[in-house]
Amino acid sequence: GIPCGESCVFIPCISSVVGCSCKSKVCYRN
């Protein structure tokens, strides 16, 4: 549920390597 400061509209979350995932076009962690 914590925003990772990254969007995932056109590309996947680069921050997925630290546990972030795409939700509603924004990368979130927990």
UniProtKB/Swiss-Prot annotation:
Disulfide bonds join 4-20, 8-22, 13-27. InterPro entries: Cyclotide (IPR005535), Cyclotide_bracelet_CS (IPR012323), Cyclotide_sf (IPR036146). Transmembrane segments: none annotated. Keywords: Disulfide bond, Plant defense. The keyword Disulfide bond applies. The presence of a 'disulfide through disulfide knot' structurally defines this protein as a knottin. Probably participates in a plant defense mechanism. This is Cyclotide vdif-A.
